[in-house]
Curated annotation (Swiss-Prot):
The keyword Ribonucleoprotein is assigned to this record: no
Assembly with partners or alone: Interacts with SHOC1 (via C-terminus). Interacts with HEI10.
Name under which the protein is recorded: Protein PARTING DANCERS homolog
Pfam families: HHH_5
Phenotype seen when the gene is deleted: Complete sterility of male and female gametophytes due to altered meiosis. Striking reduction in the number of meiotic crossovers.
Keyword Nucleotide-binding belongs to the record: no
Documented EC number(s): 3.1.-.-
Single GO biological process annotation from the record: reciprocal meiotic recombination
Alphabetically ordered keywords of this record: Cell membrane, Chromosome, Cytoplasm, DNA recombination, Endonuclease, Hydrolase, Meiosis, Membrane, Nuclease, Nucleus
One GO molecular-function entry: endonuclease activity
GO CC annotation: chromosome; cytoplasm; nucleus; plasma membrane
Biased composition (Polar residues): 1-10
Amino acid sequence: MERSTHSTGWTCLPPPPPEPAAPGRGVCAMSTSWRDKQQPSLINFIAAFLAANSYRLNFLSISPDFIFNNGELSVAFIFETNWDCQNEGAVFSRVNMLKRQLKHLYVVVAVPTKEQNESFNRSYHKYGMKLGFPTFVPVTDPEMGFEKIVKIAHALGVCKQQDIISRLKNEREQAVQCTDSFLRVLTSIPGIDNHDANALAQAIGSIEAIAKASKKFILENTDLSTDKAETIVRFFRDPQYYLSPKIN
């Protein structure tokens, strides 16, 4: 499939105004300069494929050919829809420039023929590319290439979401452990139960803050009795009290 090289070859109708954001996988931004060099049939395929996979398509003036945003993660792509050995220098120069600017960059190259594939492989080594910096994805046709792009963007988005979920889970577990430790410290004070400990936590906060609180402050901000407030103050401030053996 040959690419149209002039913007005058662009015959598709302009995209409709964007609809209100709906639940989906994310947003795909397509470079307007890249779009204007492609066959309209490929652009129509891309638009339909994105819609079928719950991505919203925007046309923007951006440096890479595509940027996918999946919530917390942005992934950029260079998409060469028909490898041209006469243009290899410009392609790899652009790759080197963008890989310094973008954290997540992939290069998808359509090499429909054996000769194009061999030419691409020679160029890859000629320009000193390192495996995975960035990752190159050779494909046999543009449609397959774009399907690969969407799969990569989606997979990375899922991994990022799972990482966030895992981190939140760990934070919740740590919070529960801290709460348990907090309650154990306070309920080790003679006469203080879980209700009292929770009341102190909500009204005053940390162990350090409770240790510094006065009897008056505890009585004004919790439902603890005078005896319990006195016990707490003595526990944290009277060495003869907190160093002596206690029998519950």
